[in-house]
Amino acid sequence: MQSKANLEDLEFLRRLPKVSLHEHLDGCLRPHTVLELAREAGYGELPEQDPAALARWFFAGADRGSLPLYLEGFRHTIAVMQSAEALERVAYEYLEDCARDGVVYAEVRFAPHLHTAGLPHQGKPGLGLDSVMRAVLRGLERAGRDFDLGWGLIVCALRNENPDLSLKLAELAIAYREQGCVGFDLAGEEAGHPAAEHLKAFQFVKRQNFAITIHAGESFGPESIWQALQYCGAHRIGHGTRLIEDLAIHQGQVIKVGTLAQYLLDHRVPIEICLSSNVHTGAARSLSEHPFGLYKRLGYRLTLNTDNRLMSNTTLSEEYRLAVRHHGCDLDDLETLSINAMKSAFAHYDRRVEWIFERIKRPFAELRRQHGLPPRRPYASEAPQG
């Protein structure tokens, strides 16, 4: 197989076709774009005025072992994303950066209501929710066409906010399902803000036969994952690091699998893993201690993601490199991650099948041929599951 040294080569990893399912639009800005948008908006509160220094500031602020502290930097990115022009630009650049990193399909999420404050320094009123959605979708549509990428937009509600607002955002997501909105999410601090409080929003989404992903098991235990699945009907779980608490482990071996952990395994519930981010927020103690490796050995359907490229100073290729370095992933494992993600995407079934064969398996096979590598070994976990 491909040697570990080669698999840690970012240039090689960028050539691998990848699929991203868990990234926040307001956490994926380019540092120089933040500076330019701040100048245009008259926003003078950025802590640094040099792109490299600003990037270091965001990373230093995020890498503090706490989700609330990790989220502090978002007030700056959100502040400069208050005009239609800014939103369209950020969305376009997001997919452009995906293309440069070898991503062939990406789902990006954001909370539209956070972008309705306007530009008080210029006396400009805030955008309406529809204007926010249209601006982001315009940027994604243009970039998808320019860079030949598949994409989908996910609307986020926030756990700490009024459930009535969550219902309004769910209705907004459904209203744009034909324009590229593919799913609904619940994000934010889990402790003290159970997903069940937002049940009306999820009941509405389920009645509309729409897709659901929920941040769960990041800063709270298995109960949060259980609520996301059994109360709210989540089709995917964001992060899921604390699912490990439903596994009994002795001397590195799993001796008992709890009913929740077994449910996710049996039902092939995708888990959106974010290695770097989970260490930065304290959801995992270190990269090597992240449960990703254990989940992989047990056969869970895993996808690999960045969460927030700016805050965690990462790319999806870098996350693949970390999976190789800290969890022993080989080229077959990396291909499985891409296939799992495309299987789990909120795109229509026929499109997922086409992209798995044409945009993932075919390029991987060509890379193997170019490097004189043997064909990919079959994986039992890739039995047809839809």
Predicted feature residues:
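Metal-cofactor-binding active-site regions of metalloenzymes
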Residues: M1-F210, E218-R236, R242-G386
